[in-house]
Amino acid sequence: MCGEVRYEVSEPFVSANYCHCTRCQRRTGTGASANGRTAEGSFRIVKGEEFVKCWDPGGGGFPKCFCSNCGSALYSQSPDGGQIAVRLGTVDGNPGIRPEKRQFTAYAAVWEPIPDDGLPRFPESSRVQ
């Protein structure tokens, strides 16, 4: 990140996962996005709120928020409220959690094979299975 946006998470992440959906691939330029979930009330922008832009992809996707200065993907907002999915790569230091599952593996990038790391795999969202 360029440093224009700073945030804090006041409570520990409640879960973390790798998302292999094509939206995450396109938004991050990677084969999977590592996300930590936290309660919406525990996430707060402390600097540069004017640089945070959010885009709603529609079609059931979560609104994606990013830094308008450097383009870094920062977090997603659950459409039903309640949770924020923070991109773990934007956390300063140790986020205190490691991804414990992989979701949307049916859409995994052919150019980046999913590692054999023993994590549970879900072809679609892990929340509906």
What are these model-derived regions, one by one?
Residues M1-Q129:
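A short Gly-Trp-Pro
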